[in-house]
Structures are given as C-alpha cells and as structure tokens.
C-alpha cells in the first residue's frame, strides 16, 4: 500500500489528486475513499492507498486517511 499527500480535492466534483512519496500524481475519486459518511479529502492530508491503472493513468483505490 502506497502513502501520499492530498494535492487537491474538489468535494463538489468528487475528485482530485494525491502526490505519492516519489512525486507521482495519482487520480483520486470519492468512491475510492474508505470511510463512513461524507467522502472527501482535505488538501495536505496524509493518506494510504493502492494504485491501479485507470483509463487515464494511475488511479488511487482503497483510500484511507492517516492520523
């Protein structure tokens, strides 16, 4: 499982990007966030996730927020 930092996330549109520890940007969709309630991420938030190859490049799945 990779770790990274939320680069930006638009809660209204439900997507954004996560910067990995090696500097790669990975697409993040709200449906991949593993939490109850409103699924959103905050800029600068630390997260853990798996990476899958999506239609438009690397995509984060199984996103969990780190304390």
From Swiss-Prot:
Swiss-Prot/TrEMBL keywords: Activator, Cytoplasm, DNA-binding, Stress response, Transcription, Transcription regulation
A GO cellular component annotated for this chain's UniProt record is: cytoplasm
Major localisation:
cytoplasm
Q: Does the keyword DNA-binding feature in the UniProt annotation?
A: yes
Q: Where is the CSD domain?
A: 4-63
Which top-rank group of organisms is this from?
Answer: Bacteria
Record-given protein name: Major cold shock protein
Protein source organism = Streptococcus pyogenes serotype M1
Gene from which this protein is expressed: cspA
């Amino acid at each position: 499982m990779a770790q990274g930092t939320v680069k930006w996330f638009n809660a209204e549109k439900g997507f954004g990007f996560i910067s990995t520890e090696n500097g790669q940007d990975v697409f993040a969709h709200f449906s991949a966030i593993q939490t109850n309630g409103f699924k959103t991420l905050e800029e600068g938030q630390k997260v853990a996730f798996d990476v899958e190859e999506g239609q438009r490049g690397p995509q984060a799945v199984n996103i969990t927020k780190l304390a």
